[in-house]
Amino acid sequence: MAKITKLEVQKRNKERVNVFLDEDYAFSISAELIYKEGIKVKDSVNSEKLKVLANKDAIIKCREAAIKTIERNLKTEKQVRDKLNLKGYDEDSITKAIDFLKEYNFLDDKDYANKFVKDKLKCQGSNKIRYSLMQKGVSKDVIEEELSSIDKENEKESALILAQKKLNSLRKTEDDTYKISNKLYRFLLSKGYGYDIIKDVVKEAINFELYD
């Protein structure tokens, strides 16, 4: 059984407290945990108590890391989980951190997908958007639900704007309409647009019915 002889708030991180056992530095712990557990100088702690505190502290540190992960921009659950895994946190702490973020609506894959679709629709087709969301770990059902809300005319209009810009660039170095059409087709395909949209957009952009 050891006795807590000193509690010292860290100078560089006021959220962490250095704990001294029997006059010697032993470990640091979250100030939040000190408060919640009612830890005080002169308290006696055994190895089991120290193990419990270490586990709880690990959960708090993981939660704080999760919050920092989403501070600058939205993330999917998979993105947060992957980052926490890379930092070396255990699965139990990660799951609890994820649950915390969800509970306070800091993490919502459906909301993420909705915003992602609206943002990327300006410069990408539904195929590329679908692939990107899959890579980010969004479920297939959520992806398809959000993609089903896309107005095909709006998607086509965005593709046409991109095609016209690309066409202006291609015409500076190429005057063969057939070659331009093929390059334009490949360009739009790389942007994630489907064949039907590409066919119509290429026709409209260069006024050449190559795909009849």
Swiss-Prot record:
GO terms for biological process: regulation of DNA repair. Coiled coil: none annotated. This is Regulatory protein RecX. The keyword DNA-binding does not apply. Its main location: cytoplasm. It comes from the Bacteria. It comes from Clostridium botulinum (strain Eklund 17B / Type B). HAMAP family: RecX (MF_01114). Transmembrane segments: none annotated. Belongs to the RecX family. It is found in: Cytoplasm. The keyword Cytoplasm applies. Modulates RecA activity. Pfam families: RecX_HTH1 (PF21982), RecX_HTH2 (PF02631), RecX_HTH3 (PF21981). One of its GO terms (cellular component) is cytoplasm. InterPro entries: RecX_HTH_1st, RecX_HTH_2nd, RecX_HTH_3rd, Regulatory_RecX, WH-like_DNA-bd_sf. Signal peptide: none annotated. The lineage of its organism: Bacteria, Bacillati, Bacillota, Clostridia, Eubacteriales. Keywords: Cytoplasm.
